[in-house]
C-alpha cells in the first residue's frame, strides 16, 4: 500500500500482482507486465529466486528496469538494483541490545540465553542468528552471557515460537533471555513465558511489527526489536525507481542497504503506527 501510494503521488500508475510466494506464478506476472510494456518492475522475489531469473532476463531484453525489494534475485539474474535491509546488521543490533540489558539486569554471575531458529538451511535466518551471537560477544567482554539453547521452530510463525520457547524454558529453568529470528517467534515465546510464569525473560527479534511493538508498549517480555521496515525499504525502492525513470539518477549500487533501527521500550512510541498493516 505504501509503495502504491508513493507511485500515485508521483503521478504514476501502479499495477499490482500478488504471487503468494509462488515463483512460477511470479514468472507469469512478470511476463504479463512485459507484455503490457510497463516502464519498470518492482518485485519481492519469490523463493526459489533462481526460478524467476528467466523472466527477469526477458524484462532486461525489453529494456524494462527491474528493482527488487527485501531480497536480491539470483546472482546471475538481470536486475538493476535490490533495496534490502542488512540481515547481519539487524541480527547484530538485537544481540547487542539484549546483552546490554542482561548485563544491567544481572550485574554478577553467568547469564543464560537461547535462540529460536527458523528453518534449518535458511540463509537469511542463519545470518541473523549468528549476527545476534556476535552482537552479544561484542558487549559481553567478560563472557558471562552463555548460549544454552538453539532450537529450530521449523517456520516463522507465532505457534512455532510458542512451542519452541516452551521447550526451551522447561529444559533451561534459569534462562534469562530468548532471541527470535523474527517477531512472530517472540510473540509466541512471550505467550509461552507468561504461561510458565516466566514473564521476567527478556526477548528480542528482527522485524518490528505492530503487534510486537504493542506488546513492548504493554511492558511484556519484548524489549528489543531491530526494525526491518517494509515501508522504509519500499519508500527507498520507489524513490529510486522514480528518479531513474525521470532521468534524475540511477541507483548507486546493485545492492542498496537500508540501515536497521533498534526499537526499545524507551523509543517505541516514535515508531509505533496504530494504522500499520505490518
Residue spans of the language-model regions?
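A residue-level marker of the well-folded mature domains of exported/periplasmic proteins
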Residues: 1-278
Amino acid at each position: 500500500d505504501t509503495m502504491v501510494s508513493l507511485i500515485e503521488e508521483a503521478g504514476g500508475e501502479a499495477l499490482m500482482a500478488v504471487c503468494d510466494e509462488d515463483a512460477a506464478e511470479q514468472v507469469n506476472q512478470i511476463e504479463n507486465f512485459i507484455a503490457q510494456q510497463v516502464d519498470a518492475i518492482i518485485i519481492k522475489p519469490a523463493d526459489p529466486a533462481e526460478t524467476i531469473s528467466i523472466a527477469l532476463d526477458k524484462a532486461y531484453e525489453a529494456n524494462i528496469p527491474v528493482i527488487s525489494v527485501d531480497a536480491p534475485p539470483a546472482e546471475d539474474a538481470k536486475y538493476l538494483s535490490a533495496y534490502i535491509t542488512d540481515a547481519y546488521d539487524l541480527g547484530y543490533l538485537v544481540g547487542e541490545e539484549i546483552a546490554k540489558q542482561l548485563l544491567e539486569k544481572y550485574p554478577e554471575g553467568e547469564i543464560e540465553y537461547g535462540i529460536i531458529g527458523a528453518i534449518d538451511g535458511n540463509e537469511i535466518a542463519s545470518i541473523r542468528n549468528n549476527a545476534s551471537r556476535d552482537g552479544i560477544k561484542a558487549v559481553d567482554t567478560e563472557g558471562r552471557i552463555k548460549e544454552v539453547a538453539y532450537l529450530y521452530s521449523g517456520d516463522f510463525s507465532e505457534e512455532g515460537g510458542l512451542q519452541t520457547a516452551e521447550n526451551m524454558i522447561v529444559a533451561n529453568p534459569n534462562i534469562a533471555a530468548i532471541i527470535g529470528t523474527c517477531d512472530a517467534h517472540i510473540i509466541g515465546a512471550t505467550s509461552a513465558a507468561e504461561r510458565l510464569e516466566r514473564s521476567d525473560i527478556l526477548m528480542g527479534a528482527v522485524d518490528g511489527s505492530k503487534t510486537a511493538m504493542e506488546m513492548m508498549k504493554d511492558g511484556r517480555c519484548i524489549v528489543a526489536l531491530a526494525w526491518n521496515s517494509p515501508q522504509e525499504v519500499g519508500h527507498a525502492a520507489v524513490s529510486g525507481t522514480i528518479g531513474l525513470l525521470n532521468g534524475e539518477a540511477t541507483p548507486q549500487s546493485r545492492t542498496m542497504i537500508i540501515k536497521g533501527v533498534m526499537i526499545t521500550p524507551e523509543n517505541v512510541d516514535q515508531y509505533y503506527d496504530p494504522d500499520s498493516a505490518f
